[in-house]
């Protein structure tokens, strides 16, 4: 029998020290990585329950194991809440990640060698949208579309030309570093014109979509996937939504083709996050996320930095560092020394290598969860600019670190 009084600190002090260090890092550093956020205490609690003990291969009411009465309730809650949140018909909450959700979509609808038309990774797409280093680019014939070099927005004319030239079986919309509104209906029309499936990966925009501040692709696309963290502010995981005629193929593609038992403790946390996302407080939060991103982009422009495509319509944007003669890797390192966390990111047609880059990506979901509003976002953008103006100046980095820590103290993530 286990003693419920035993703690991680008592059982595994080495691991506990690492966890404590990460807790402190999250509290003491300002998080600007666009794909990161802070899960609520309720989401964290759900992931730490005895649901982790339960195997439940299959789906509610159709399990391969006994004893699934309560996990069926848990999964059905997640299913119903996700369906209501995005006005979806079919949903699957079992994918362990966004990448696995995407893989399930491909396997459900495509055959090896079929043509896939997705956004170029170099222009803001994702590895799983046909990159040569990902299975999506190895199993399928991957063709990439990109951005208009003048506007740095999706080149819909090029997309249509490529679609007619290559006749893809599937067109993929969605991005990992694209700051503007994506026209799902334009994608739908192009897909229909060439007889292709339309698949939308809305992982980055899901929270904004749930709140009504970004167009909803559900009902427009044949398939929609998302992660459940990022702007949705849930646990790390994935989901699939689709038109009902794809239910059988998708269920099979998730289990048994790509996964075995679902992670019931994570599905419980997804259910909590979906409930939180249906609240007015969450809608207000998403509105503030966008306002904070726009404020930061404007201030950085005023400080002499170029924002890719000129502005942002969502939670993130790319900063071109070439005018500062600075690489993304150098900027990431300098900002981390000043207690501000970003990620290096390629800009469109970046001359630098992927692990060096000419830009950084900035996102505001995490700082908005802390409680930052426009004044704090303006102050923070100026701190970022101070570091980018003098990345090798230790005195500047120390001064910015002190100011960043003061903001963190004023706006804690979890408090005590």
Swiss-Prot record:
The record marks 229 as: Plays an important role in substrate specificity. Its EC number is 2.1.2.1. It catalyses: (6R)-5,10-methylene-5,6,7,8-tetrahydrofolate + glycine + H2O = (6S)-5,6,7,8-tetrahydrofolate + L-serine. GO terms for molecular function: glycine hydroxymethyltransferase activity; pyridoxal phosphate binding. This is Serine hydroxymethyltransferase. SUPFAM superfamilies: PLP-dependent transferases (SSF53383). Keywords: Amino-acid biosynthesis, Cytoplasm, One-carbon metabolism, Pyridoxal phosphate, Transferase. The keyword Amino-acid biosynthesis applies. The lineage of its organism: Bacteria, Pseudomonadati, Pseudomonadota, Betaproteobacteria, Nitrosomonadales. It is found in: Cytoplasm.
């Amino acid at each position: 029998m286990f003693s419920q009084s035993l703690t991680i600190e008592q059982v595994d002090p080495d691991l506990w020290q690492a966890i404590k260090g990460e807790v402190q890092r999250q509290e003491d550093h300002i998080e600007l990585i666009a794909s990161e956020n802070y899960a609520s205490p309720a989401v964290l609690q759900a992931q730490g329950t005895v649901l982790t003990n339960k195997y439940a291969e299959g789906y509610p009411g159709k399990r391969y194991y006994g004893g699934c009465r309560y996990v069926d309730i848990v999964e059905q809650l997640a299913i119903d809440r996700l369906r209501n949140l995005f006005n979806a018909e079919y949903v699957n909450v079992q994918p362990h990640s966004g990448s696995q959700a995407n893989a399930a979509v491909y396997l459900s609808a495509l055959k090896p060698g079929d043509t896939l038309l997705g956004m170029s990774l170099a222009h803001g797409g994702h590895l799983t949208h046909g990159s040569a280093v990902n299975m999506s680019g190895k199993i399928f014939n991957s063709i990439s579309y990109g951005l208009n070099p003048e506007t740095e927005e999706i080149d819909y004319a090029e997309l249509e030309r490529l679609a007619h030239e290559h006749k893809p079986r599937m067109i993929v919309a969605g991005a990992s570093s694209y700051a503007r509104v994506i026209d799902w209906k334009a994608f739908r029309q192009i897909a229909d014109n060439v007889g292709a499936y339309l698949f939308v990966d809305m992982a980055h925009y899901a929270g904004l979509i749930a709140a009504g501040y970004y167009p909803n692709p559900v009902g427009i696309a044949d398939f929609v996937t998302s992660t459940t963290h990022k702007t949705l502010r849930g646990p790390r995981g994935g989901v699939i939504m689709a038109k009902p005629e794809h239910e059988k193929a998708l269920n099979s593609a998730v289990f048994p083709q790509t996964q075995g038992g679902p992670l019931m403790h994570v599905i419980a946390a997804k259910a909590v996050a979906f409930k939180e996302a249906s609240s007015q407080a969450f809608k207000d939060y998403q509105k503030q996320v966008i306002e904070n991103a726009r404020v930061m982009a404007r201030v950085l422009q005023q400080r002499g930095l170029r924002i890719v495509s000129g502005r942002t319509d969502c939670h993130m944007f790319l900063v071109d560092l070439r005018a500062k003669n600075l690489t993304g890797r150098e900027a990431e390192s300098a900002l981390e020394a000043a207690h501000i966390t970003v990620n290096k990111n390629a800009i469109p047609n970046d001359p630098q290598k992927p692990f060096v880059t000419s830009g950084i990506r900035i996102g505001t979901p995490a700082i908005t969860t802390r409680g930052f509003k426009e004044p704090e976002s303006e102050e923070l953008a100026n701190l970022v600019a101070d570091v980018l103006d003098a990345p090798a100046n230790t005195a500047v980095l120390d001064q910015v670190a002190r100011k960043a820590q003061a903001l963190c103290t004023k706006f804690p993530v979890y408090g005590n």
